From Swiss-Prot:
Gene: Lysmd3
Basic and acidic residues bias (residue ranges): 286-305
PANTHER family, sorted: AND PUTATIVE PEPTIDOGLYCAN-BINDING DOMAIN-CONTAINING PROTEIN 3-RELATED, LYSM AND PUTATIVE PEPTIDOGLYCAN-BINDING DOMAIN-CONTAINING PROTEIN
Keywords of the record: Cell membrane, Glycoprotein, Golgi apparatus, Membrane, Phosphoprotein, Transmembrane, Transmembrane helix
Organism: Mus musculus
Phosphoserine: modified positions: S55
Main localization category: membrane
Carbohydrate-modified residues: N7, N26, N199
Protein name (record): LysM and putative peptidoglycan-binding domain-containing protein 3
């Protein structure tokens, strides 16, 4: 029984340094011989995998700055000054408590690689990087220059030469020698006036804009005056004249109906002399009509007799 117990001793499971391969030893020697090649690998899932990748990226992006501790510095003040956490400073400097900070002469501060602090702050004792920096790309460019840069520089040089040639031709064509200052001023003003139409044409308003039908403000004011003031005045005057003409026409027509044989001037003259109109009455009766107008009572007495 003792030998059997010795053969079937319990061995604890062993884990390799990598943390992924597990070997289970709770079995006999025969089982170990049969299953010595079988190993099991545990894959990381979910948050653990994300945490490992995040920690790896975080270590790649961290730069260690060294700062001498001065009088009045505290752990919280340094953390606020360099925008990092107190826990990160403790982890980098292997500090157990906050009081261990005062036993140090210099402190290491973890800062992100691409930040404003790494560009503006210059540490006193240099800068330490956790991982070696990659080979810069500009060195390869210096070793093997590109053809595109050469062609661009050549084209730029040729363009500048052409510009210089044009300037020389312009200087030769124009007479820059002036006898007095007035000629210089007149020449400069002429050039300014010559270039003014180009600038004005750029800011010129489109005549076919559409919102105002291409008319100016003064045209709109004239149209409003015509529509709002002049047209109503003419309308009122026209209707007043028509009313007066209608009244005079009706008066003349009424008088002509009462005395159809008289013309208006004769009728008016007879009415002023208090003589009744005689036109249209027979000639033999005109005298009787006049006498009747003069003495109607005598005429009535004659008829009674």
């Amino acid at each position: 029984m003792a030998g059997r117990n010795q053969n079937r001793t319990v061995s604890l499971p062993g884990i390799q340094a990598s943390g992924h391969v597990l070997a289970f030893g709770n079995c006999t020697d025969n089982d170990m011989l049969e299953e010595d090649a079988e190993v099991y690998e545990l894959r990381s899932r979910g948050k653990e995998k994300v945490r490992r990748s995040a920690s790896r990226d975080r270590l790649d992006d961290i730069v260690i700055l060294t700062k001498d501790i001065q009088e009045g510095d505290t752990l919280n003040a340094v953390a606020l000054q360099y925008c990092c956490t107190v826990a990160d400073i403790k982890r980098v400097n292997n500090l157990i408590s906050d009081q261990d900070f005062f036993a140090l002469r210099s402190i290491k501060i973890p800062v992100k690689r691409f930040s404003s602090l790494t560009e503006t702050l210059h540490p006193l004792k240099g800068r330490h990087i956790l991982h070696p920096p990659p080979v810069p790309y500009f060195q390869e460019q210096d070793i093997v220059p590109a053809d595109g840069s050469l062609s661009s520089s050549e084209s730029a040089g040729s363009f500048l030469k052409e510009v210089d040639r044009d300037i020389e031709q312009i200087v030769k064509c124009t007479d820059t020698k002036k006898e007095n200052l007035n000629e210089v001023v007149s020449a400069l003003t002429a050039q300014q006036v010559r270039f003014e139409p180009d600038n004005k044409s750029i800011h010129r308003k489109d005549p076919y804009y559409g919102a105002d039908w291409g008319i100016g403000w003064w045209t709109a004011v004239v149209i409003m005056l015509i529509v709002g003031i002049i047209t109503p005045v003419f309308y009122l005057l026209y209707y007043e004249i028509l009313a007066k003409v209608d009244v005079s026409h009706h008066s003349t027509v009424g008088s002509s109906h009462l005395h159809p044989g008289l013309t208006p001037p004769t009728q008016h003259r007879e009415m002023e002399n208090e003589i009744g109109p005689t036109k249209g009455i027979p000639v033999g009766q005109q005298d009787d009509h006049k006498l009747y107008r003069q003495d109607p009572q005598a005429h009535d007495a004659q008829h009674k007799t």
